[in-house]
Amino acid sequence: MSVPKAKALLTVCAALLLCGCGQALSEREIVRAVFFARQQGAYSACLLLADQNAESDGVQYKTASARGDTAAQALHLAEDALPGRLYYGLLDLAALPPGCDWADAQTLGTLLYDKAQPAPELSVFVLDTADHSWAADAASLYEDMKAVEREYDLHCGLQQLFTQTDGCAVPAYRADSGYDFALLAADGASVYVSGLQAQLAAALCGQTGRFFTAFAGGQAVCDTRVNVTAEDTTVQLHLRDTDFQPLGAYNEDWQALLCTELQQAFSALTADDAADFFHLQFWHVNLWGPGSALPVPRLEILFE
């Protein structure tokens, strides 16, 4: 086959793949987000879709939702409520039900992966506990979660639900500001943390590169770039371009107060060894071999 013909064939194949084997995207139901909730012992699933028939300018959405005994059944029924063929290739957000545990995350993550693999841009949150109306709230929930990602330099990909066998860690949406963080252990209780502790957990999990949070009892806000390195069980927290913004007529040593709170948050996060959320056991075993005693994790804070 000549080179021009080969290029033409590849172009045709790519076009068919992108448009769904001959069906244009404009004729398909484009899924942007999937939300799950549990209500009265049953699952509820909501598909947020691009409304391609909307007459107004800008991005418009529509929803399809259903209830089922399982998450898979609820999602299948929501899909069946739509007249067109679904396209998951642009799916970039999924919300797990509030209060979910590790088993829920694995089940729902597998279901989503089957729909949208490999889904490199798909972000995962845990939904808040508010009683949402899918038709009224789904679009604003989607926009809010994407805004949180941008503002806080936050990203938890679908693949991060499966990187460890003993647990996973997922940001949790909150309607006011910032985000909470869910630590879901396979063989232990799920732990939800908030504020500075949540953002430290996200940094330790490699899901954020920024702290932007109140501290010192709400007296000030810290905005800083953050990077994490480790030597055995000693974690180095590198803070760059740090800015402290007092929220009143206070004159404090903000750096010292932040360091104190970070140390307290780190101690609390590493006290429970139900799962190796921050890979400290993993790196220690790689250095010293299986069976070696794990030293108490230590945090070094470096302002740069």
PLM feature segments, named:
Residues 2, 8-9, 18-304:
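Membrane-proximal alpha-helical signals and transmembrane carboxylates
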Residues 14-15:
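Residue-level signal for mature regions of secreted extracellular proteins and peptides
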